[in-house]
Design a protein with these regions (language model features):
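N-terminal Rossmann-like FAD-binding beta1-loop-alpha1 element of flavoenzymes
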Residues: 7-33
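Conserved N-terminal/central alpha/beta ligand/cofactor-binding core
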Residues: 30, 35-132
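Core beta-strand elements of the Rossmann-like FAD/NAD(P) dinucleotide-binding domain
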Residues: 2-5
Length: 132
């Protein structure tokens, strides 16, 4: 049987899965996801820690996050790529929440942010002990 798709996503990591969800949400066509292993075996599932994003502009900002990322990468990282990733991270978090990711919250109902290696501010979001 021949199946027709408008989009083909290869791999089951967060980048491919996010793209597939965005295309599906936009109603742009049928999406096929092809992967050689189970979802649990993708590198994204093996990542440790959480997801870094500026979420509170009162105490954090993109400039600080970019600086932290460049330092952590020993200034070898492509500055333009780092800036793009950092500045798009908040929208990525909003998308993940829209798709059902339930990040940990504090008593006030705000994201329960953590500060982990290489970060000067509390900007790491988690879901229990599952994110990375």
């Amino acid at each position: 049987m021949i199946r027709k798709f408008d989009f083909l996503v290869i791999g089951s990591g967060v980048a491919g899965m996010s793209y597939a969800l965005k295309v599906a949400d936009a109603g742009k066509g049928k999406v096929a996801i092809v992967c050689k292993t189970t979802l649990e075996e993708a590198n994204t599932a093996k990542a440790q820690g959480g997801i870094a994003s500026v979420t509170n502009m009162e105490v954090d900002n993109f400039k600080k996050h970019i600086k932290d990322t460049m330092i952590a990468g020993d200034f070898i990282s492509d500055p333009a790529a780092v800036e793009q990733v950092v500045k798009n991270a908040p929208q990525g978090i909003r998308d993940l929440v829209k798709w059902g990711v339930n990040f940990d919250k504090n008593e006030k109902g705000d994201f329960d942010l953590h500060r982990e290696g290489g970060h000067s501010e509390f900007r790491i979001l988690h879901h229990a002990d599952d994110t990375g």
